[in-house]
Amino acid sequence: LAEENLQARIRGNILMTIANKKDALLLNTGNKTETALGYCTLYGDMCGALAVISDLNKNEVYGLGNWINEKYEKTIIPESSLNKAPSAELSHNQVDPFDYKIISPLVEDIITNGYNVEKLVESGYDYEICREIINRIRLFEYKRHQGAPGIRVSKKAFGTGRRYPIINQYKI
């Protein structure tokens, strides 16, 4: 994992250098689901001046890509990107360890709707998955404090609209 994170950080440094040389801003492409789960690397894929899709969950990002292609009646977002298994692409044949069809709505219910474990289980989610995801959201708050500011499109986004302590084993 340390070597994979190093790869992401080197890539981030290269992209920041290119942006700097071109007098441009690097856009961050982290989404709400990955950010919630801490499935991102500080000073790596979290680099950037503006997180343009940070308030869209993983499923919404794919939906947006498909919508763009349909709206413009041509392939702007490559089909290969929209149809492949999600991956951080930090090792050979790596795929993300989450089923985003389940996890993205769960993250939305926790973050946007403020559901607690009891309400989540009532809604049909598995208790253990709920506990795991809530714990990940709590554990990785420190990363979100260091991420690029994002564009808010939901009623509850990470950033100034949602800040929690990062010390003293704070529980959500």
Residue ranges and their predicted role:
Residues 1-172:
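ATP/NTP-dependent adenylation/nucleotidyl-transfer catalytic domains that generate, transfer
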